[in-house]
Amino acid sequence: MYLGYIRVFWQPWLIGLGFSVATIGILESGAGRFGAISGLTQVIGGRFSDSRGRRRLILAGSAFLITTWLTAATAFLFGAPMLVYLAYVLWGLSLLSLPVIDAMMADYIEIPDRSRVYSTMLVANFVPGSITGFFAGQYGSSLSPPVLLLLAAGLETVGFALLFAKVRDKGAATSTRKAPLSLMATWDAISQFRGFFGVFMMDSMAWALGTGILYALLSTRSFTLIDFGLLALTQPLGVVVGTVPGGWLTHRIGARRLLMASEILGASMTLGWAFYPVALLIPLYGIVWGFAISSWVPAQFHLSTVIFPEARRGEMLGALATSIYLIRIVGPILAVGLYLALGYSAPMTAGAAAIFANVILIMKFIPRDQSGPLKRKPQSN
């Protein structure tokens, strides 16, 4: 619920606290939602969830988030930038639960229903966030960052209590299988799906390049809190509209086509931000952005949970997340370099070109037939 305004206002808040665009880019690469720490923690969380249960990892992620927002609120309340660095690290650690949540969903949901259920959950997550993001934009001048961050901590505490009361491990997830802890064992498993991993790694890097520091860049173009609030409202509308192709039609038109459509929409939106960054077009960009998300994420979830073996599902989902996050580190760093060298539009233009290039990888490595479980075949790449 609160991530709707955190996601949109976090970077502008940091600008107001005195952080530069370059510093924000480095922080996002190292310890942000898509940074190095975030990626490394996910493979650890996924692997341990296979052998020790999903529940405790999910609760740990929520606890880290509560600490994150309390630390960030203290940083803004007392004007202590050093605490922002700690908040970034805690935020990265909180994401250890992401692949665990996906693995738990796959444990309980049958294959034909996974993409539809996942799309429904996307809507349930985005719509409340859009409302809070919109009102935060409208009243951002009277509600300071510490107040909104404390609200986030409070809402996450409620979420933790609900998780503690309701979430239970399924028998298969609590088996005593001892997963090998060597990196070589994980690498051997990943090598069977090199092309599959490559598609999602390329997508992650391209989107990080095009949008990784977007909100910080928009802050330099005189966009207001009201503008950011409008973006927070319209992006989830795109998610709602895109739920139909993203979830309900995965098995009818194929995940492959949905992934390509998502990339084309995303690249078009990124080019729009690059060359037409005007407030009048914010609703259009927000809806297209949300539609791209809702077309991509359920298809990725469906493909991942089908292709990865059940006994190592948490580990492989974590490995995929880690691969995606580690390659994403490059995006904000390149974006900062392009911004400093060539100006505002360069990062988004380069990101759009990379997104278009990923369509070729999708055509090469994602199979057409989605009528049943994907079959592994020897990789020639």
Where would I find each of the regions flagged by the language model?
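Helix-loop boundary and gating motifs at the non-cytosolic
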Residues: 1-39, 192-231
